[in-house]
Amino acid sequence: MTNHTQIAYNMNMLFIETSIFTKRITESVCDEDYHKLQVHLAEHPDAGDLIRGSGGIRKIRCAASGRGKRGGARTLYYWDAPDKIYMIFCYLKNERENITPEQLKTLKKLVEENLK
């Protein structure tokens, strides 16, 4: 994974973002709400629901500007090490309910080839 941003936060947790995640999250969520999500994940990295058949990718809700958590953004991330969380993809609920099987296959391959 060559295109990513590294951000260190509390509890020595390192957040590593894919370039598409960085683009999507900045379009969807204000900095304050994203920071709250990072703090929450640093303290509870297993908070997101495991996506079946994903190779360990988790999905968690994140409040989006003016939408709250329910109607907000969905954040996909991978956590396998005690000090790193890979922020993989983000989308708004009004764009789609879930990722497609094709997208899931691609993200699973990304995890298997680059993050494990």
Where are these regions (language model features)?
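Amphipathic alpha-helical transducer elements in NTP-driven molecular machines
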Residues: 31-34, 104
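Residues that recognize and position ribonucleotide moieties
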Residues: 14, 58, 97
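Enriched for short, Lys/Arg-rich terminal
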Residues: 78-116
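Short, surface-exposed coil-to-beta transition loops
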Residues: 70-75
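A short, surface-exposed loop/turn module that caps and links secondary-structure elements
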Residues: 39-69
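Short Gly/aromatic-enriched secondary-structure transition segments
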Residues: 25, 37-38
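Short, low-complexity Ser/Thr-rich regulatory SLiMs
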Residues: 64-66, 77-80
